[in-house]
Amino acid sequence: SLVGSEMCIRDRTNEMIKSNIEQGLTTLGIEFGSTRIKAVLINTDHEPIAVGAYDWENSLIDGIWTYSEEEIWAGLQGCYKNLVEEVKAKYGVTITKLAGLGFSAMMHGYLAFDEKDTLLVPFRTWRNNITGQASHELIKLFNYNVPQRFSIAHLYQAILNNEEHVNKIKFFTTLAGFVHWKLSGEKVLGIGDASGMFPIDINTKDYNEKMLADFDAHIADKNYPWSIREILPKVLVAGENAGYLTAEGAKLLDPTGTLQAGTPMCPPEGDAGTGMVATNTVTKRTGNVSAGTSVFAMIVLERDLSKVYEELDMVTTPAGDLVAMAHSNNCTTDLNSWISLFHECLTSFGVKVDANELFSTLYNKALEGDADCGGLLAYCYHSGEHITGFTEGRPLFVRKSDSKFNLANFIRVHLSTALGAMKTGLDILTKEENVTIEQILGHGGLFKTKGVGQTIMANAIGAPVTVMETAGEGGAWGIALLADYMNNKENLSLDEYLSTKVFKNSVAETIAPTKEGIEGFETFMTRYRNGLAIEQSAIDNLK
């Protein structure tokens, strides 16, 4: 019978996975997100075979967003234990050894240590907006965009504040770098995560020498006993070995002592880099867009930009190619509020409608609208928007009396404006720097309704947008793939390895833009830029 043969295949697959685990052929990736720590175990075919998770929250202590050291280790152990339990339940075996191991985490922030390896001040995460002066001065000093969350901005702000601990610093790093160091003894960092600490020279695949020298000269009068290069982690690129799991490290990960030491470890990475790996967008001229509550686009560049743009953050792929990131705080929140208003309206008439059906029907309605949204204008600014220069926001909908005001255009304008700020950032790349974008991969809530967000996005960017059938397991899977790449790269570059070994059979749907769609979106964007004064007036006058 068919069912019998399916069960037979499943049993055979399970037996293969079981022997993979018992022989120590599986690879583990763990990523520390801002609300969840996630572990993904992959088999020799790069497929996730088990996951573990641990939920955690940052705390606001003395005005600083932080996680305690105890929480970091409790979270790591809890997440690993959860994975081990799933492996036991699914396959009836216990993990004793691994083929490879990798850690990733939210980027940036500040973890500083003294000569006794003691944490000098509580971990300052990327969420802290406390380094405004440092960021401003470093942009001038380096002629390079240094956002507030970059580690060097945190260090320089501590210097500007004359904080006592700065004199005692022996080493500072990111969260992924910290966990990796404690498990391997190695003070290293993957280049993607390192690019969120200090600017990178993409030719040498290391920190920018001139900027290191400029920084030391700039703070010379402080007479600190360190130079900046001495206290930064060593930069490694994808595929390089970054050390081995030590006996103490194995105990930190698995306090039961079941996991053996000696596993090779890949360079620890940041969540931007692992996201690029998990979406197969590390190739030049490609990028990915994550669109949900907020939206960000990451585009892999072929060369340095001609000048500094504060709207764009510069990071790198795990292989060390330059990436421009346009991040916008606001995306789908306002549209969700409107859809919930329509839901309330239907409920008032006693109509029961499923939320997914409501979203899908209204999103699809947008495709019937005019390419330029019929002259309508909206801003989805629930909060401030740095790309367009707003420190706070007011969601806003406005039209002329002769605009084509109908449901299709109404939904379409709210979908289009959700990408307006991000498009402003991308226009700098495509129009002022002549960057070519050939392919975009979309993921996140905006793409949940098939074909709609994708169509609007393709017209906004002017490039085909692909959405994969499975969203994958995100960054934890990405760092597991990087650990596997270290062991099995042969002579392949990272993008070749991903395309030929990992994603060769992945199912995806691509939508290309149309000439009419691109022109319509440009017309909408002219209206969007011209109307920013209306948004400003709403902020000034609606208190």
Functional labels for PLM-detected ranges:
Residues L2-I9:
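Short, small-residue-biased leader/transition segments that mark boundaries at the very start
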Residues R10-V121, H136, K168, R229, ...:
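N-terminal glycine/serine-rich phosphate-binding loop of ATP-dependent small-molecule kinases
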Residues I17-G24, L28-G29, I95, H136-L189, ...:
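Active-site core segments that coordinate phosphate-bearing ligands/cofactors
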Residues K88-T125, N145-P147, H180-G192, G196-D201, ...:
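Short beta-strand-loop/turn "lid" adjacent to the catalytic site in phosphate-handling enzymes
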